[in-house]
């Protein structure tokens, strides 16, 4: 693990929400690294600030990889209704932003066959959000 990744992982547990938001953005490209994935799910389900949830979901959606969408799907399956709304808002922000998030639907298609039921369920929600982005 690089020193940069270690530092970013430390920021993911910072008491400052702004640092946690930055960590979510910075870790999104490392969604396939187990330590980063664990931290990212924690940020998606951040109990203290919805900005962390929203902006981490947006960053992961912009990545559009199967690994990044899997993490959002896991969080969607675990989230209460309020947190799920903020996850959806983050996904929507990425889909409607410059360049959109072209890989999301393809990733959801792959995750629809995932052996983990929670991932399949979450991916179905994300696919519905992507197909009808409000």
Predicted regions and their residues:
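Short inter-helical turns and helix N-cap capping residues of alpha-solenoid HEAT/ARM repeat scaffolds
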Residues: 15-16, 48-49, 79-84, 115-117
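Hydrophobic alpha-helical segments that drive targeting, anchoring, or assembly
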Residues: 21-22, 44-61
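Mid-chain, well-packed structural core segment of small domains
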Residues: 71-90
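Structural signature of alpha-helical solenoid repeat scaffolds
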Residues: 28, 61, 92-96, 128
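Long, hydrophobic N-terminal alpha-helical segment
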Residues: 4-28
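Residue-level detector of extended alpha-helical repeat arrays and alpha-solenoid scaffolds
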Residues: 19-20, 53, 84-88, 120
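Short, charged, intrinsically disordered terminal tails
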Residues: 121-134
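Amphipathic alpha-helical scaffolding segments comprising HEAT/armadillo-like alpha-solenoid repeats
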Residues: 1-11, 31-45, 65-77, 99-112, ...
């Amino acid at each position: 693990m690089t020193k940069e990744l270690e530092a970013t992982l430390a920021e993911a547990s910072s008491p400052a929400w702004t640092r946690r938001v930055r960590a979510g953005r910075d870790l999104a490209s490392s969604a396939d690294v187990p330590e980063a994935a664990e931290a990212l799910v924690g940020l998606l389900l951040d109990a203290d600030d919805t900005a962390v949830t929203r902006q981490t979901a947006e960053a992961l959606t912009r990545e559009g990889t199967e690994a990044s969408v899997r993490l959002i799907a896991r969080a969607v399956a675990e989230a209460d209704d309020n947190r799920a709304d903020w996850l959806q808002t983050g996904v929507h922000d990425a889909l409607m932003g410059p360049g959109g998030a072209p890989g999301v639907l393809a990733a959801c298609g792959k995750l629809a066959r995932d052996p983990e039921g929670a991932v399949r369920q979450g991916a179905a929600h994300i696919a519905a959000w992507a197909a009808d982005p409000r």
